[in-house]
Amino acid sequence: MTAQTTPERRPDHLTLALPKGRIMDDAIALLSQAGLPLTRPEASRALRHEFPGVTVLELRNQDVPVYVDLGVADAGIVGKDVLLEAGRPVYEPVDLHFAECRLSLIREIGASGPIARVGTKYPRAARAYLQERGIPAEVVKLSGNIELAALTGLADAVIDLVQTGSTLRANHLEEVDVLFHSSARLIVNRTALKLRRERLRPLIARLRELTAPAGEES
């Protein structure tokens, strides 16, 4: 028995991949400002939401670049941290300037010994950072509560996202270095950019206008 294929979509229909949670709410608000007929979906178990000319797929953060890269979604919104970790060759035309944070190397306050093991949800970024600095540390991939790895001795340091730093201060931890700053980005499938250019290029242009820093509007 062969698997069913998704019916071919019209060139004027967009499929968008958005991450669940706060980013999705902010993304829908911004996309609505940009002219798409979107509203926040009502609470339900539905994972696909239909609007006039637009389908929204509600995904886990890490899956957004996959759906866009493989062409199931024409475009999506995802954090730069997730995008770099995924390593998918998607087009990234707009920094949307929300969901801002930073990926940092974190240790217990006052820790000064060598770093032999690092815990993180971002092994790709961690290995690149450690290799660049010549630190021969083992990288342990973790899924949540990353700070505990430093507090319990599982790791000598952790690499994790930081927004306000309040969680670090509450747990006697500090940032030692910043790997990079992250924010939400619009990503686009490269083939879709050609096939649906009449929908995607005006959307990209409008989002650039809406998110341009003061004094840089086109």
Swiss-Prot record:
- Write out the catalysed reaction: 1-(5-phospho-beta-D-ribosyl)-ATP + diphosphate = 5-phospho-alpha-D-ribose 1-diphosphate + ATP
The free-text domain remark for this protein reads: Lacks the C-terminal regulatory region which is replaced by HisZ.
Function of the molecule: Catalyzes the condensation of ATP and 5-phosphoribose 1-diphosphate to form N'-(5'-phosphoribosyl)-ATP (PR-ATP). Has a crucial role in the pathway because the rate of histidine biosynthesis seems to be controlled primarily by regulation of HisG enzymatic activity.
Q: What is its main location?
A: cytoplasm
Q: In which pathway does it act?
A: Amino-acid biosynthesis; L-histidine biosynthesis; L-histidine from 5-phospho-alpha-D-ribose 1-diphosphate: step 1/9
Which InterPro entries does the UniProt entry name for this protein? Answer: ATP_PRibTrfase_cat, ATP_PRibTrfase_CS, ATP_PRibTrfase_HisG, ATP_PRibTrfase_HisG_short
The Swiss-Prot or TrEMBL record annotates one GO molecular function as: ATP phosphoribosyltransferase activity
By sequence similarity, the record places it as follows: Belongs to the ATP phosphoribosyltransferase family. Short subfamily.
How does this polypeptide assemble, per the annotation? Heteromultimer composed of HisG and HisZ subunits.
* CDD domains assigned to the protein according to its UniProt record, in alphabetical order: PBP2_HisGs (cd13595)
Which BP terms in the Gene Ontology apply to this protein? L-histidine biosynthetic process
Among Gene3D superfamilies, the record links this protein to: Periplasmic binding protein-like II
Q: Where is the signal peptide?
A: none
EC number(s) on file: 2.4.2.17
Top-rank taxon? Bacteria
Please report a single Pfam family linked to this protein.
HisG
User: What is the name of the protein in this document?
Assistant: ATP phosphoribosyltransferase
Subcellular location(s) per record:
Cytoplasm
What keywords tag this UniProt record?
Amino-acid biosynthesis, ATP-binding, Cytoplasm, Glycosyltransferase, Histidine biosynthesis, Nucleotide-binding, Transferase
Q: Does the keyword Cell inner membrane apply?
A: no
Q: Record's GO cellular component, any one?
A: cytoplasm
